[in-house]
Amino acid sequence: MQSGGRQAEAPGRGPRVLVVGGGIAGLGAAQRLCRHPAFSHLRVLEATARAGGRIRSEHSFGGVVEVGAHWIHGPSQGNPVFQLAAKYGLLGEKALSEENQLIETGGHVGLPSVSYASSGVSVSLELVAEMASLFYSLIDQTREFLQAAETTPPSVGEYLKEKIRQHMAGWTEDEETKKLKLAILKNLFNVECCVSGTHSMDLVALAPFGEYTVLPGLDCTFPEGYQGLTDCIMASLPKDVMVFDKPVKTIHWNGSFREASAPGETFPVLVECEDGDCFPAHHVVVTVPLGFFKKHLDTFFEPPLPTEKVEAIRKIGFGTNNKIFLEFEEPFWEPDCQHIQVVWEDMSPLEDTAPELQDAWFKKLIGFWVLPPFQASHVLCGFIAGLESEFMETLSDEDVLRSLTQVLRRVTGNPQLPAPRSMLRSCWHSAPYTRGSYSYVAVGSSGDDMDRLAQPLPSDGKGAQLQVLFAGEATHRTFYSTTHGALLSGWREADRLMTLWDPQAQWPEPRL
């Protein structure tokens, strides 16, 4: 294999472009490129048998459940996922209403309908609201550190704990109530771990935390499943663009590769697949999850990535947030119940204890969201993040179901509560092409690392020598961890290529 690579030319035919990964970033890039006549030589290489990546809707329990992405966060006109979903007719009337689009949530999770304590009693919702108000006011205060070069303490978790200790000095209740307040706050810490996709808020950097941008709009779901969005994008692509069950082994770049069907032409990139197939290209857009990068950093690129990009991949955080769906024949909750909180009275955010994975992994579960009732079943969706979530993946379905049945019987104070009829769960950490859920800015990293991850290669590339481009939620500095961040990143790299090959190109969608 020769190195150096001449400037790629494809007179009259346009460049050959490969997209690695068929998630929302890869599909968004492909859809945008396919609308331009210069990009007729385009393939999307998807490792699995389905498109969508971390968008994964499954028909189960007599309805559709979201094993992956759940909500459109900030469904309003500034959100491209909302725009596309509205254009394709995939949203309900309430989500489309102007009133819903104008609601400012601050990105905070709403209050529960009911809160159960581990002693089997209901927790006062007034007390829950008081603690939520304190917690989210402190979360909002973290934005004050956005421009700080250095912060003490360095993490969001340590900052929150420091402030909570200060507030505790003014608490006048009895010791039991103070303990319950701390237990509620511990639940809210765990909620924030799910939101951030991290094991602990002590791992999340304080200074850049406020750089994440919250869009207006009350989070909404897709009545027929999030995958309807990726299905619609897929339907707009030429039929030969998607190549399924084609995991990539190594991306060879900065070379000079030839192909028998194109004599006399050289390509700077060669994508080698696990099955031995090789695809030469002028450009490759890599959209694989950061968790996959971390796992395969030493073998996925040849030559290896520049040190600066390797360091960015290592420093940016990438954690696990899983869901556990429980199906019941009859609901034990009230008809208007939307969210059940679970509070463990022996837990406190101020106590740094090693996770008790074997015996208490379920204590990290934040509670359950009530899904709209299906035809013949009633379903709860629980969320759990971090090492406990990853440990849960190693257990059998029977073990998980048994543990959660015991939890529900304990917190409701009803030892006769019927066990769930069935269960479904996500296992994103053990998914080989994902290795987790989504990214966060970890202690020791910053938004600059996400920008470094997004930079194409070679870094000094001029003209059509631009070879390897990067997209995916972890490459978006302000919308990381979201589907709209992923989609925008795919559009960004498509625009980069269109500008390269046709500087006068008219953009088919607003460049948000």
Curated annotation (Swiss-Prot):
Pathway: Amine and polyamine metabolism; spermine metabolism
Record's GO cellular component terms: cytoplasm; peroxisome
Record GO terms (molecular function): N(1)-acetylpolyamine oxidase (3-acetamidopropanal-forming) activity; polyamine oxidase activity
Subcellular location: Peroxisome; Cytoplasm
Cofactor note text: Binds 1 FAD per subunit.
EC numbers, comma separated: 1.5.3.13
Residues the record lists as N-acetylmethionine modifications: M1
Motif (Microbody targeting signal): 510-512
Propeptide span(s): 1-6
Keyword rRNA-binding tagged: no
Transmembrane portions of the chain: none
Enzyme type, top EC level: oxidoreductase
Keyword Transmembrane helix on entry: no
Keyword vocabulary terms for this entry: Acetylation, Cytoplasm, FAD, Flavoprotein, Oxidoreductase, Peroxisome
Single GO BP term: spermine metabolic process
Top-level taxon in the UniProt lineage: Eukaryota
Residues annotated to bind substrate: H73, V195, N321
Positions of FAD binding: A25, E46, R54, H70, W71, V248, E473, T482, T483
InterPro entries for this protein: Amino_oxidase, FAD/NAD-bd_sf, Flavin_monoamine_oxidase
Pfam families: Amino_oxidase
Cofactor entry: FAD
Annotated family: Belongs to the flavin monoamine oxidase family.
Annotated function: Flavoenzyme which catalyzes the oxidation of N(1)-acetylspermine to spermidine and is thus involved in the polyamine back-conversion. Can also oxidize N(1)-acetylspermidine to putrescine. Substrate specificity: N(1)-acetylspermine = N(1)-acetylspermidine > N(1),N(12)-diacylspermine >> spermine. Does not oxidize spermidine. Plays an important role in the regulation of polyamine intracellular concentration.
Other comment: Oxidizes N(1)-acetylated polyamines on the exo-side of their N(4)-amino groups. Plant PAO oxidizes spermine on the endo-side of the N(4)-nitrogen.
Self-association and partners: Monomer.
Name of the protein in question: Peroxisomal N(1)-acetyl-spermine/spermidine oxidase
Source species: Bos taurus
Gene from which this protein is expressed: PAOX
